[in-house]
Amino acid sequence: MAIGLIGRKVGMTRVFTDEGASIPVTVIEATPNRISQVKTLEQDGYQAVQVTVGERRPARVTSSLKGHFAKANVEPGRKLQEFRFGAEEGRDIKASGELKVDLFEVGQKVDVTGITRGRGFAGVVRRYHFGGGDASHGNSLSHRAPGSIGQCQTPGRVFKGKKMAGQMGNVRRTVQNLELVRIDEGRQLLLIKGAIPGAPGGDVIVKPAVKTVVK
């Protein structure tokens, strides 16, 4: 595992290279992440850093969290996130400190996690891209029906995981190995190549990639 940042998706735009190539990028606003706790092997059994970001109304902060934030001397945030790290990492990290966009480098590969847009109840054509039935030739009732969902008496049930109509979206998803194209330290922005999960304004988690792509 590695240390990352909590950010907020701003939207998409494009940047141009010196050669004139257009690169679609997603803009992530990563304001300084305040360190609320540092976990150690001796006390917690593993090493991790817990961060918070943004603001939260005092009425929305529970008593236990008020004490937690007060102990670290940081303002309560809208989100808490924990990043585990190895034995050789995080030596300079201390509670009440901050993590900023300079944690990353241009050209680095990152993984981005977010909550996808909720689409509500959707049929199989929209949800799983089923082909659907004939538009005519005697078909008048099942243009967008899923068709058969299983066998008869053996096994006499529908298998788990069968692709059927249901809730679409609003789930946690991670996109791996995205390239970090540009970093704007002045405005605390990360420009990442390609699309990421979620709607503009949603919280995302940016971490160094856990897998390496061999070309």
Curated annotation (Swiss-Prot):
Family listed: Belongs to the universal ribosomal protein uL3 family.
Protein keywords: Methylation, Ribonucleoprotein, Ribosomal protein, RNA-binding, rRNA-binding
Residues where N5-methylglutamine is found: 153
Pfam family, one: Ribosomal_L3
Gene for this chain: rplC
Lineage: superkingdom: Bacteria
Record text on subunit structure and interactions: Part of the 50S ribosomal subunit. Forms a cluster with proteins L14 and L19.
Protein name: Large ribosomal subunit protein uL3
Function statement: One of the primary rRNA binding proteins, it binds directly near the 3'-end of the 23S rRNA, where it nucleates assembly of the 50S subunit.
Keyword rRNA-binding carried by entry: yes
GO molecular function, one term: structural constituent of ribosome
Processing after translation: Methylated by PrmB.
InterPro entries tied to this protein: Ribosomal_uL3 (IPR000597), Ribosomal_uL3_bac/org-type (IPR019927), Ribosomal_uL3_CS (IPR019926), Transl_B-barrel_sf (IPR009000)
Keyword presence, Ribonucleoprotein: yes
GO CC, any one term: cytosolic large ribosomal subunit
Protein's GO biological process: translation
